[in-house]
Amino acid sequence: MRKTIIFIILLFSAVSNGQENSLSDEQMNSSGANKVEFADGDEEIQKLAKLDIENQIPFLLLQGGIDQMISYKDQKFEEKFKIYFFNYGCIAPSEKVESIYNQVIFNYLFAKYGKSWIKEIRKDIPGFKEFKKSH
């Protein structure tokens, strides 16, 4: 019985420490991804994305809706390339706004990882098709 309890404690501590890729509420609330829908123009949207990169919390913005769930494959992508998917749900900024933000993040991924991430990324992210055409 004692061995079982020790095993359970060790298991829970390993699982809780394995969640490296989660953000605090403060990081989420202060992120550019959270503020992008209120940005005043393309340059401010790009600036918010660059700030998220500098703060080591780059996001890829997803159009909302039920079909935009973040899958296990997406979570593996997040871990591997050190980014976060941001799903607004049903009320999201325009696809144009998301595309402008995402273009900055795509360029960051390209500069840091080359083309390796392109094969693994989900293809429905706003702005991805345009980015892929130009690279």
Regions found by a protein language model. Give the residues of each.
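Bacterial Sec-dependent N-terminal signal peptides
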Residues: M1-L23
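Short beta-strand and adjacent turn/loop elements
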Residues: E20-H135
